[in-house]
Curated annotation (Swiss-Prot):
Protein name per Swiss-Prot or TrEMBL: Phosphoribosylaminoimidazole-succinocarboxamide synthase
Species per Swiss-Prot/TrEMBL record: Dechloromonas aromatica (strain RCB)
Pfam family, one: SAICAR_synt
GO terms under biological process: 'de novo' IMP biosynthetic process
Pathway recorded for this protein: Purine metabolism; IMP biosynthesis via de novo pathway; 5-amino-1-(5-phospho-D-ribosyl)imidazole-4-carboxamide from 5-amino-1-(5-phospho-D-ribosyl)imidazole-4-carboxylate: step 1/2
UniProt-listed Enzyme Commission number(s): 6.3.2.6
One GO location term (cellular component): cytoplasm
InterPro entries: SAICAR_synt/ADE2_N, SAICAR_synth, SAICAR_synthetase_CS
Keyword 4Fe-4S belongs to the record: no
Domain of life according to the entry: Bacteria
Organismal lineage: Bacteria, Pseudomonadati, Pseudomonadota, Betaproteobacteria, Rhodocyclales
Enzyme class per UniProt: ligase
Amino acid sequence: MTAPLFESTITSLPLINKGKVRDIYAVDADKLLIVTTDRLSAFDVILPDPIPRKGEVLQAVANFWFDKLGHIVPNQLTGIDPETVVAENEREQVRGRAVVVKRLKPLPIEAVVRGYVIGSGWKDYQETGAICGIALPAGLKMAAKLPSPIFTPATKAAVGDHDENVSFATAQANCAADLAEALAGTGKNGAGLADEARIAAIRLYEEASAYARGRGIIIADTKFEFGIDAAGTLHLIDEALTPDSSRFWPADHYQEGSNPPSYDKQYVRDYLETLDWGKVAPGPKLPADVIARTSAKYIEAYEKLTGKTL
């Protein structure tokens, strides 16, 4: 097994951005190299310890969904082998954890779809009887399945900041303002693309949820990101239905009224909640057993979803 990768050092390509988990490099004017590291963030803080094989799992899960759901909306994939765009001595850094993608203009929103009342949605529902302003039936319990999935967009926060839930009208306005220049001459507008993203996100969630349920996994909620090409065509970008962007529950542990265990970083979040820590950088170091348990959770999620071994 290769050593965990906390940070990539690809010097043969220009570095464009380092996110919470992904390092992005320019391949050329039309393509990017995205390297999924083993970094883990919790409460919007990057923790100092990498989680072994986490990056491999995230990329493998995303690739699985991109392939499975490609008929719903185009995606960012180019089909180019990442090892062919870096220097020979850098191939180990991209093997199994990187992807070459189209350069696309991102929509300025996180496309969140919720199928169950949990997390911040549960808190919101308890206080208001709604989630992000969307009224729901009275009397729902924690982890209850919603009558139908709901779309609750959020702003995209910079590294270290928190995403903020916004109304769909605000999401449309943000897209209209941010995409106006990119859409000039295409006959499309940002508000319309926000609606396209909403429809696509719900379809993606519904189809993925049905598949995962057959594999013994409940997808409680998830977050998508979308971008557009020069013609204004919507594409699914970033990651898709991974343990980082979604809440996966084992179906055999699901019980309405309680918070099920998750195949994701919730184990780390639960540990961090036991600490006297202000949830600001720098994050605390993780014990070896928490790191090992979290790595195993990620690998288990991939294998249970796909029926394959990593």
